[in-house]
Amino acid sequence: MNYEEITTTIPGPGVSQDDWNDEFQGCDCETQCSIENQCSCMTGATDNYSEDGRIVATSLLIECSTNCACCLLPYSCRNKVVQNGIKKKLKIFSTSEKGDGVLAEEPIQNREFVCEYAGECIGDQEVKRRCEVFKEEDNYTLTLKEHFGEKEVKTFIDPRLRGNIGRFLNHSCDPNCEIFVVRLGRMIPIAAIFAKREISVGEELSYDYGVSGIDGDNRKLCLCRSENCRKYLPMSVSPIE
């Protein structure tokens, strides 16, 4: 299917410019950003990334942005990884059973950034509309679920019309990648794909699409061929679950 290539997630139907432009104030760091130096963009007990750019934090990960004082430093802030884009050589290829997929053309270390799952950030009504319009085709919409106290917040990212190489990663019940919720200086997050173990040259990249909300034998068969394969691909009860 034809789609427009983009490098990072952009606002789409159902997401207002006011919401998209709801940005954080930014840090006032005068040296390298870190927990030790009390960078305000780091909200956990550890730095977001190691010195060599591998992910350390696992929740509420906020990268520094153009609103931060560290932008004026003569060296690159190490709290900027996802926004710097894809650094690894990746290739789209045709699989024998699963359509297109993505493979690594160079080694990827555990916890290294692979790519963003870039697409349009859309509202729930637009998710439902697109599912109806494209009901005979595969559903690409990724739902990010976050919990703040008792409140659940969902963010919908759809690369169907505008996206990047991340849309071609297939599901595996024993994946070598995983998705993290990352904020690039604004409240609305994006989805970043990181390696969850060492990945060899020529290995297909995959992540777990999630827990299925539907049981039964009418679901699409999983073809990951892993030892712990769950037999069927995950399916949601509704488009916005």
UniProtKB/Swiss-Prot annotation:
It catalyses: L-lysyl-[histone] + S-adenosyl-L-methionine = N(6)-methyl-L-lysyl-[histone] + S-adenosyl-L-homocysteine + H(+). Zn(2+) 2 binds at C27, C41, C64, C68. Residues 88-210 form the SET domain. The keyword Endoplasmic reticulum does not apply. Keywords: Chromatin regulator, Chromosome, Metal-binding, Methyltransferase, Nucleus, S-adenosyl-L-methionine, Transferase, Zinc. One of its GO terms (cellular component) is chromosome. The keyword Zinc applies. Zn(2+) 3 binds at C33, C64, C70, C77. PROSITE patterns: POST_SET, PRE_SET, SET. S-adenosyl-L-methionine binds at K98, G99, D100, D138, Y140, R167, N170, H171. Its main location: nucleus. Belongs to the class V-like SAM-binding methyltransferase superfamily. Histone-lysine methyltransferase family. Suvar3-9 subfamily. Probable histone methyltransferase required for embryonic development. This is Probable histone-lysine N-methyltransferase set-23. It comes from Caenorhabditis briggsae. The gene is set-23.
